Each structure stands twice: as C-alpha cells, then as structure tokens.
Amino acid sequence: MANDPIHQFQVSRWIPIDVGGVDLSFTNVSAFMVATVVLASGFLYLTSSGRGLIPTRLQSVSEMAYEFVATSLRDSAGSKGMKFFPFVFSLFMFVLVANFIGLFPYFYTVTSQIIVTFALSLLVIGTVIFYGFFKHGFGFLKLFVPSGVPGIIVPLVVLIEIISFLSRPISLSVRLFANMLAGHITLKVFAGFVVSLSSLGALGIGGTVLPLLMTVAITALEFLVAFLQAYVFTVLTCMYINDAVHPGH
C-alpha cells in the first residue's frame, strides 16, 4: 500500500447510506469537501473580522484573493459581471483550499476526482446558460453566431461554436483533475523510492538522496500547481460568465 501511487485516490465509505437503492454514503471525499468549506470559511472569517489599518499577513492573503477575483471578473465581464463575484470567489477559494489540503500527508485531494471537478464545471456552465436565457432570452443564442461571418458558412460556424461550448465543462474539469492526479502520483512514486531504498541499509540510504531531493522539488512545484490550477479555473469561469452577460461577439 505504501508504494501504490493509486491507493491515495481510493474512495472509502465512512457512513453507509442507502436510500431506495441509491448509494448516498458519506465518504472520505465528502468529509474533505466539508473540511474544505469549513477551512475556507473559517480563514476568511478570521482574516476579515477586526481588520486594522495595518493588515496582518493572513489578512493580506485574503485581500489579495479578493482583489484577484474581483479584477479577473471585472476585466472579463465588466461591471455587470460583478454580480457573480460571490459565486466566482466561492469557487476560487474552494478549489484553492481543496488543492492545498491534498498536499498534506494522510489528507485527501478531492479535486483529483473527476466527478468533483466535473460537478464544479457543470455548475459554472449551468449558471452561464441559466443567466444567459434569463437575461437575454433567445438573444443568448447569438453567442453561437459570431458577427461578421459570411452567410454561406454560418451553419458550419454555428456547429463549431455549439461543439466548443458543450466541450467547456469537459475541458474545464479534466484540466483540473488531470493536473492534480498526475502531480500526486509523481510525488507518491518518488516518495516510494525513498522509502524502498532506505530499507536497503547504508547503500540504500546513499541512493535515496536524489529521490529525496526530487520529492522536495516536486512538493514545492505541487504547491505552485495547486495555486495555478485554481487561478486557471477562475479565469476561465470569468470568461464563460462574460458570454452570459454579453452573448454577442
């Protein structure tokens, strides 16, 4: 088990729940999603309450997160898109905290599960579609008809735009899932090398130096990837929201 890089992604039932043949068990994934929400909410509450003129380091971090999301949303969707700020900020904090939690030993990375990332992506696309039709009616369909396209190729362009739009939740979810999965597998493999070689005695201990250095380097890289994936997910979400706010190209 120690050297199995896939074992860390196993879903375990903690509280079995069966309702009419539907498995609604509370799993380790469920527990760490709850933990992610609690930690993110607690962090924001502690850093935003009792703010002083001179911000603490943690307060500065929360303000940087706030400004990043606000700037990204404003740049992508304009002032009208700011109504989606609570939604986008919540997504950013959830993905960011979930990614960071998974980097600690014996903790679970919920964003390494495709069902979790796909659910987040469907939430984004569902929000875009709902608001687009709610605000613009059938005018939202102008999203699939770019302006300035010659009439003879409009059907082909519309088909391409529809396929591109429908592929968004797939690309958005797979990008996050694949990066977190691959990074953790690589980290586990090199950590396994260290454990295996150290059990060989003095000769093995000498051979652990390179794998150990690689493990440290990959761990540092994974912290960067954890932030970058939350960053990319948020920026793309802001761009998709712009399509709902301004469906015309």
From Swiss-Prot:
<dbReference type="GO" id="GO:0005886">
    <property type="term" value="C:plasma membrane"/>
</dbReference>
<keyword id="KW-1133">Transmembrane helix</keyword>
<protein>
    <recommendedName>
        <fullName>ATP synthase subunit a</fullName>
    </recommendedName>
</protein>
<keyword id="KW-0138">CF(0)</keyword>
<keyword id="KW-0066">ATP synthesis</keyword>
<dbReference type="Pfam" id="PF00119">
    <property type="entry name" value="ATP-synt_A"/>
</dbReference>
<dbReference type="InterPro" id="IPR035908">
    <property type="entry name" value="F0_ATP_A_sf"/>
</dbReference>
<comment type="subunit">
    <text>F-type ATPases have 2 components, CF(1) - the catalytic core - and CF(0) - the membrane proton channel. CF(1) has five subunits: alpha(3), beta(3), gamma(1), delta(1), epsilon(1). CF(0) has three main subunits: a(1), b(2) and c(9-12). The alpha and beta chains form an alternating ring which encloses part of the gamma chain. CF(1) is attached to CF(0) by a central stalk formed by the gamma and epsilon chains, while a peripheral stalk is formed by the delta and b chains.</text>
</comment>
<dbReference type="InterPro" id="IPR023011">
    <property type="entry name" value="ATP_synth_F0_asu_AS"/>
</dbReference>
<dbReference type="GO" id="GO:0045259">
    <property type="term" value="C:proton-transporting ATP synthase complex"/>
</dbReference>
<feature type="transmembrane region" description="Helical">
    <location>
        <begin position="84"/>
        <end position="104"/>
    </location>
</feature>
<dbReference type="GO" id="GO:0046933">
    <property type="term" value="F:proton-transporting ATP synthase activity, rotational mechanism"/>
</dbReference>
<feature type="transmembrane region" description="Helical">
    <location>
        <begin position="143"/>
        <end position="163"/>
    </location>
</feature>
<keyword id="KW-0375">Hydrogen ion transport</keyword>
<keyword id="KW-0812">Transmembrane</keyword>
<keyword id="KW-1003">Cell membrane</keyword>
<dbReference type="InterPro" id="IPR000568">
    <property type="entry name" value="ATP_synth_F0_asu"/>
</dbReference>
<feature type="transmembrane region" description="Helical">
    <location>
        <begin position="208"/>
        <end position="228"/>
    </location>
</feature>
<comment type="function">
    <text>Key component of the proton channel; it plays a direct role in the translocation of protons across the membrane.</text>
</comment>
<comment type="similarity">
    <text>Belongs to the ATPase A chain family.</text>
</comment>
<keyword id="KW-0406">Ion transport</keyword>
<keyword id="KW-0472">Membrane</keyword>
<feature type="transmembrane region" description="Helical">
    <location>
        <begin position="114"/>
        <end position="134"/>
    </location>
</feature>
<feature type="transmembrane region" description="Helical">
    <location>
        <begin position="26"/>
        <end position="46"/>
    </location>
</feature>
<dbReference type="InterPro" id="IPR045083">
    <property type="entry name" value="ATP_synth_F0_asu_bact/mt"/>
</dbReference>
<feature type="transmembrane region" description="Helical">
    <location>
        <begin position="185"/>
        <end position="205"/>
    </location>
</feature>
<keyword id="KW-0813">Transport</keyword>
<keyword id="KW-0997">Cell inner membrane</keyword>
